[in-house]
């Protein structure tokens, strides 16, 4: 079986043919291939395809690193198709698998440890095998290709892109601090001239723009502030400038104040631009993490971990307390409760929860965020995949977490089974249209013929009925009894009402008041049966006296019981003494 050796160089592809078919099985291969003459005696050049330029060489080598067969390499291997019983030695097993999948190529591939000795000798003495290739040119091309390949790898490295996020969030935090310091300095400096302005305007950007626009407060009549402030604030600012109590300043002082105000405006605009850049980067690199915790919290988590890959290796428990390391170690040292959350506390989902549910929400959010980070870091998407497809896990998880939070807080739940829009809000359902019902066609009815009655067998022997009273007579008797009962009830009610009225007159009360007092027990009857009303005070006194009497009786009973017990004890002692 003929043996061919595929060699990838910085100058091009070389296909070498072994002079000995059993070259790889020889024991003295390493010693014979130690010199250039020995290598030339073992193999010879079959074909060589040179790269056209350095860019072409970079594309070819980058494809080989990924284990892909390029069209240039496939055309070189077409020269071996016509030969029968061919074996091909390849240095990279991944590339060997890709070559084996080429259609119409019946080749036995060899990509194991037996090829290491021959490849070491070929690379060492390559200029002697390829005519017209100087050793100096070969080293120069190898150095240039290695630099280009390293630059290519760094360009598409995910760690390098993470560095952009880390630097952006760090710069954003620094800008916030500097902007706060500069804005406060502008207010303090310009406040000597116009102290009332700081109480009217709270926005730092609007304050700096107004300082640049108006300058001296005496220019309030000629300055148009409609572009900066609404009408209400504009009127109040001009009124305050007219009767301001501030001191006068020179033009040189105003120039320095306005120079600082320009810095505030410039930094604010750049901060807005940087925030937009950070949002776009986070949506491109970590869409699921951004959907769950937001771009700022997600960027701070990545910056704290160092990279997205390092963050994806962290479990949910670590992600939950990331940023609270000092509090964690202090709690472990003092044996107190450990913190429930770190940087993740600033996520909007945890901010919506109340104090009791913040810890639960942090734990659940950290678990979902860890899954989203792993998808962002390790998932391989097609080129046709949209941003919605990449962030589908995070959007769905956020919807479920919002539903869970609403359940914990006792708020109305969002409906399940609703399609979720890319921004995380449920999509509106389609309009339901009610169609008219089909009318019934009466003309299509048909009349069935009467079926012949079938004789049924008797299941039980029939018994002759005995004569009973008519139903009408029974009904009449029942109705008469009911009418008599009703009339008797009415009579009894009337007699009771009449008696109550008489008793109420004797007691000197109305009928309603007499009934109420009678229910409460505030009516007393003498020996003759005449009623009399009792006041609430008298009732309370009577109840107290009754309670005292009950207590006295209980005390007497206890005393008698104690006396009996003492007598029994004395009798027992006497018996023992005897």
Swiss-Prot record:
<dbReference type="InterPro" id="IPR012976">
    <property type="entry name" value="NOSIC"/>
</dbReference>
<keyword id="KW-0539">Nucleus</keyword>
<feature type="region of interest" description="Disordered">
    <location>
        <begin position="443"/>
        <end position="578"/>
    </location>
</feature>
<feature type="compositionally biased region" description="Basic and acidic residues">
    <location>
        <begin position="547"/>
        <end position="561"/>
    </location>
</feature>
<dbReference type="GO" id="GO:0005730">
    <property type="term" value="C:nucleolus"/>
</dbReference>
<dbReference type="GO" id="GO:0000480">
    <property type="term" value="P:endonucleolytic cleavage in 5'-ETS of tricistronic rRNA transcript (SSU-rRNA, 5.8S rRNA, LSU-rRNA)"/>
</dbReference>
<dbReference type="InterPro" id="IPR036070">
    <property type="entry name" value="Nop_dom_sf"/>
</dbReference>
<dbReference type="GO" id="GO:0000447">
    <property type="term" value="P:endonucleolytic cleavage in ITS1 to separate SSU-rRNA from 5.8S rRNA and LSU-rRNA from tricistronic rRNA transcript (SSU-rRNA, 5.8S rRNA, LSU-rRNA)"/>
</dbReference>
<dbReference type="InterPro" id="IPR002687">
    <property type="entry name" value="Nop_dom"/>
</dbReference>
<dbReference type="GO" id="GO:0000452">
    <property type="term" value="P:snoRNA guided rRNA 2'-O-methylation"/>
</dbReference>
<feature type="compositionally biased region" description="Basic residues">
    <location>
        <begin position="569"/>
        <end position="578"/>
    </location>
</feature>
<dbReference type="Pfam" id="PF08156">
    <property type="entry name" value="NOP5NT"/>
</dbReference>
<comment type="function">
    <text>Required for pre-18S rRNA processing. May bind microtubules.</text>
</comment>
<dbReference type="Pfam" id="PF01798">
    <property type="entry name" value="Nop"/>
</dbReference>
<feature type="domain" description="Nop">
    <location>
        <begin position="285"/>
        <end position="410"/>
    </location>
</feature>
<dbReference type="GO" id="GO:0031428">
    <property type="term" value="C:box C/D methylation guide snoRNP complex"/>
</dbReference>
<dbReference type="GO" id="GO:0017069">
    <property type="term" value="F:snRNA binding"/>
</dbReference>
<comment type="similarity">
    <text>Belongs to the NOP5/NOP56 family.</text>
</comment>
<dbReference type="GO" id="GO:0000494">
    <property type="term" value="P:box C/D sno(s)RNA 3'-end processing"/>
</dbReference>
<keyword id="KW-0690">Ribosome biogenesis</keyword>
<keyword id="KW-0698">rRNA processing</keyword>
<dbReference type="GO" id="GO:0030515">
    <property type="term" value="F:snoRNA binding"/>
</dbReference>
<dbReference type="GO" id="GO:0032040">
    <property type="term" value="C:small-subunit processome"/>
</dbReference>
<protein>
    <recommendedName>
        <fullName>Nucleolar protein 58</fullName>
    </recommendedName>
</protein>
<dbReference type="GO" id="GO:1902570">
    <property type="term" value="P:protein localization to nucleolus"/>
</dbReference>
<dbReference type="InterPro" id="IPR012974">
    <property type="entry name" value="NOP58/56_N"/>
</dbReference>
<dbReference type="InterPro" id="IPR045056">
    <property type="entry name" value="Nop56/Nop58"/>
</dbReference>
<dbReference type="InterPro" id="IPR042239">
    <property type="entry name" value="Nop_C"/>
</dbReference>
<feature type="compositionally biased region" description="Acidic residues">
    <location>
        <begin position="462"/>
        <end position="485"/>
    </location>
</feature>
<feature type="compositionally biased region" description="Basic and acidic residues">
    <location>
        <begin position="495"/>
        <end position="505"/>
    </location>
</feature>
<keyword id="KW-0687">Ribonucleoprotein</keyword>
<dbReference type="GO" id="GO:0000472">
    <property type="term" value="P:endonucleolytic cleavage to generate mature 5'-end of SSU-rRNA from (SSU-rRNA, 5.8S rRNA, LSU-rRNA)"/>
</dbReference>
